[in-house]
């Protein structure tokens, strides 16, 4: 049973197991709180549970547990509890994740919260620490990539990767109108004249997305759609990006450069 769980489920199971032994001044926080809130996590979940404790000064590392000291005046708890233990609210969780996690991991998780309206992007930005503080620059980089128009973790992942490469003029869910057809693309990069589509396998195998159509018919319609988009004079190229491209920043950079997207060193 345990081996069948993914790392996120194992992390939550460990949090549940540790809950009875936590002090009454503790609350689940950071990535642990993000998983409790139901936010997606790319890559493996951490091996240790995160909590804040308003009676602790500094950070304490234990086997399977990291305790973060926090000023109780700055602690906001959400309405939910996990096995009786309070959980830091969505906004506080987002700020902690943005400061401490890899930018791609943080952006995918927090963008989901923005998309689900669990947090407001502007309010999130207002609560970020100064750039010179620990994790401040990282958190602001993450904030730049957030957009409620992103429709999936893949699009969130793509957006933060672009930001990490210095591409900032990004238009998600842009529409091209051709002879009465309204074609919406995942991303439009007007400075480069490049359309980017996140090319996941799901659209060809998911029954709901297929809507009774044969996968070959969906593929044919995608080709016709792309042909219409390419008729626009401002469109120089159409890039299809997969999860594999995004997993390596160097690989993604090479793909963009091959299509004429200017990436500064």
Can you name each region flagged by the protein language model?
Residues 1-135, 171, 264-265:
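Short gly/ser-rich loop at a beta-strand->alpha-helix junction or flexible surface loop bordering the NTP-binding
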Residues 114-265:
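Surface segments flanking catalytic/ligand-binding clefts of nucleic-acid enzymes
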């Amino acid at each position: 049973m345990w081996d069948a769980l993914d790392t996120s489920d194992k992390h939550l199971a460990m949090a549940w197991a540790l809950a009875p032994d936590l002090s009454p001044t503790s609350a689940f926080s950071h990535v642990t709180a993000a998983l409790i809130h139901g936010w997606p996590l790319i890559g493996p979940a951490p091996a240790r549970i995160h909590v804040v404790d308003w009676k602790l000064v500094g950070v304490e590392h234990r086997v399977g547990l990291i305790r973060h000291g926090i000023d109780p005046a700055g602690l906001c708890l959400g309405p939910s509890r996990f096995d009786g233990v309070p959980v830091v609210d969505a906004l506080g969780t987002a700020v902690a994740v943005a400061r401490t996690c890899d930018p791609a991991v943080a952006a995918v998780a927090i963008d989901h919260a923005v998309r689900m309206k669990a947090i407001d992007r502007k309010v999130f930005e207002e609560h970020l620490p100064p750039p010179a503080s620990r994790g401040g620059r990282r958190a602001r980089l993450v904030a730049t990539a957030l957009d409620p128009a992103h429709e999936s973790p893949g699009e969130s992942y793509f957006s933060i990767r672009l930001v990490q490469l210095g591409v900032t003029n990004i238009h998600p869910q842009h529409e091209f109108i051709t002879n009465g057809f309204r074609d919406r693309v995942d991303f439009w990069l007007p400075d480069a004249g490049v359309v980017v589509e996140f090319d996941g396998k799901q659209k060809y195998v998911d029954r709901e997305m297929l809507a009774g159509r044969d996968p070959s018919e969906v593929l044919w319609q995608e080709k016709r759609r792309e042909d219409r988009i390419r008729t626009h004079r401002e469109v120089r190229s159409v890039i299809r990006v997969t999860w594999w491209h995004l997993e390596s920043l160097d690989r993604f950079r090479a793909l963009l450069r091959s299509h004429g997207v200017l990436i500064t060193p």
